[in-house]
Amino acid sequence: MVAIITEKFKLHNAEQFTESFSESSASTYYMFIGKSTEFSGDRDGTGATDTTPPTPLDSVSDEFYFFDQMIAAKKIASSDVINCIPRRDWSNSTTFDMYRDNYSSLNTTDSGASSLYSSTFYFRTSANRVYKVISNIPTGANTAAAAFSGSEPTTEGTSLFTIGGYVLKYMYTISASNATKFLTTDFMPVETDSTVSAAATDGAVESLRVTNVGTGLTNGTYYAAIEGDGSNAGTSSGAIARIVISSNQIQAFGTDASTTSGIHAAGSGYTFGTINLSSGNTFSDNTLTTAAAVGGTGGAIDVIISPKGGHGSNAVKELGAHFVIVNTTFSGAESDDILAGNDFRNVGIVVDPTNFGSSTVATASTVRQTYALKFASVSGTFTPDEKITQASTSAIGKVVEFDS
């Protein structure tokens, strides 16, 4: 039996996790630190050291060890969590992938990726603006991708626009606070721009791809109804494609109505669509009343179906943000719960921990996971990680901190 963990399922899990921090019956998460002593490798036989720490193991015994080694923990706020995607930075002369609805292992992207969400179909600029690549095919009678060639984009409008030979969609700008907190060398946070999302139309056809430019076609601008399952599909009230033929070949998709093929009317409700260029299906006017054959031979255009909700409706879903960044900062001793005089080697997250000796879920902003001993009198001093033994019971403990 063949099975697949879909992108939608991964995204659902990530969204459920982030939502669990702020929903009405929210879970309580703490980030913990632990293990003040060096890695010795004695327990698992790996020979691990602080220089070459061991790979964490997913076992019952290791879970108990992690609890036993905990030193302190800090509550994770909902503002400490965000969905994220692999970081892709804009750079001129770089070939980015373009958005398409049908990538697979049998139909890979220009970079060789077998899925949309593992491709390079979006990028971030130096001003933290994030754009989706709608087309990477330059204008003219072209069907192949090319490198971006132009200045860094700055547009923040809701319409598609052309720059550097690419057709782009502005998605959102990473806020200064989120950039400081969540932007890393490998990942970048995802936000939703309310203006962009409000302008999106579910099932609108927003892009095309010329797969065969044809030969000997009659120059001019033509219009064709986009067939499919959209509202009023196949009629002048549905989605309509604009086909520009120059030098007897179909021009690539773009946003310039006079020189590029594109979308005259986007329509709505499409989950599949086709364009028929045969005689009787193309027209010289955008009301589709005067038939005009394109002539020649060949010529083919694919309809690219937009994501559910339309481009820009939901950046988290559209960009495949099934990764999550958690950023909680330990700052000093924090109410004397966080150690300041020793080191640690384990970092992790625990959900709904209870207060010691009860079944009540902890709510304090910081908690300590160590016992405290107060001596009536002390001779000498203790050192971090020193092993101490109680003479009467032979109980053994390790010193994490000592305050004289």
Which stretches of residues belong to each language-model region?
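Tryptophan-rich substrate-binding surfaces of secreted polymer-degrading and adhesive proteins
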Residues: 1-201, 302-304, 352, 361-362, ...
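Conserved, function-critical positions that sit in or immediately flank catalytic
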Residues: 161-404
